[in-house]
Design a protein with these regions (language model features):
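Active-site environment of divalent metal-dependent phosphoester hydrolases
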Residues: 11-14, 61-64, 92-95, 121, ...
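Conserved, mostly hydrophobic/aromatic
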Residues: 7, 46, 73, 106, ...
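Alpha-helical scaffolding within the catalytic cores
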Residues: 37-42, 67-74, 97-101, 157-161, ...
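Mid-to-C-terminal alpha-helical segments outside catalytic/metal-binding sites
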Residues: 1-9, 13-53, 223-226, 235-272
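Well-formed, non-transmembrane alpha-helical positions, independent of function
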Residues: 45-48, 105, 163, 191, ...
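Catalytic pocket-lining loop regions of alpha/beta-barrel enzymes
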Residues: 112-113, 123-228
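Active-site gating/metal-coordination segments in enzymes
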Residues: 52-53, 61-145, 150-151, 194, ...
């Protein structure tokens, strides 16, 4: 069985512990993370779990971090072919810097998507300063992956993802955490499940709830070819998240697609 982890974070060793702890505290983890967000640790965990590839990223919390993070991710992906690199962007960078040049650099260096995390970046997912970025991405077959949902603040909910995805219908958008982290309400999520350019990952979802039934209903509401496995490393352990996914009772053909084939087809920039 082949597996791609479509949702992992990595950090330079000197800040990895601090970044991981801050993230875990923000999201009220039901159990403390056992990992630290360091490159070698992720490589070791992937090997132990039998996971072939991991998409890696880190969100820029200021405009000044954008280029540094993108080059860091590029460097680590060059060194480790197991890594699928994904860049980042910030609304302040989009407003003040030459974002088109940065997106071109990303594409030329194998970073075909960008990750945003509005809660930590202090702008909303549908911030109109980001619309020129989304337009440029749409023109150049880049994809967006965004943290989606937080019941405590309204900066990345499914209604904001819906606005972006409908404004840019050829921009492929990955809504993380089944589309609305911490508020898995079908009524709120259903509108994005009906959009052809919406994809979703299952990271940081099933591990937060005892009753898996409502989340399984949400999973089955999405296009079955648009669902990806993701662990949210280092918040969760890829090996344990894979084991939990295998125990959900997902139909074998769909399970194989979620674990590997769907993302392999989505990520057409290189053979996986």
């Amino acid at each position: 069985m082949r597996v791609i982890d479509a949702h992992t974070h990595i950090f330079p060793d000197k800040i990895a512990d601090k970044a991981t702890i801050a993230t875990a505290e923000y999201f009220d983890m039901p159990e403390p993370p056992n990992h630290h967000g360091k490159v070698q640790e992720l490589l070791d965990v992937l090997a132990e779990a039998g996971i072939e590839y991991a998409m890696v990223f880190s969100a820029a919390t200021s405009e000044h971090q954008v280029e540094h993070i993108n080059r860091y991710i590029f460097k680590e992906a060059q060194a480790h072919p197991q890594f699928i690199p994904c860049g980042t962007m910030h609304a302040d960078y989009a407003a003040n810097q030459d974002f088109k040049a940065e997106l071109a650099w990303m594409r030329q260096n194998g970073l075909h998507g960008l990750k945003i995390h509005p809660e930590f970046q202090h702008f909303v997912l549908d911030d109109e300063r980001m619309f020129p970025v989304y337009e440029e991405m749409e023109k150049n077959d880049m994809f967006l992956i965004s943290h989606t949902g937080d019941p405590r603040v309204n900066v990345s909910g499914p209604e904001r993802m819906y606005r972006v995805a409908t404004a840019f219908p050829r921009l492929r958008c990955i809504a993380t955490h089944l589309g609305n982290w911490g508020d898995w309400d079908m009524g709120k999520i259903r509108p994005i499940t009906e959009l052809p350019n919406i994809y979703v990952d299952i990271s940081s979802s099933f591990s937060y709830v005892e009753d898996k039934g409502p989340l399984m209903d949400i999973l089955h509401a999405y296009d079955p070819k648009h669902i990806f496995f993701g662990s949210d490393y280092p918040i969760w352990c890829p090996k344990k998240e894979l084991e939990k996914t295998l125990r959900l009772g997902i139909e074998p053909g769909l399970l194989e697609d979620i674990l590997f084939h769907n993302f392999a087809a989505f990520y057409h920039y290189r053979a996986l």
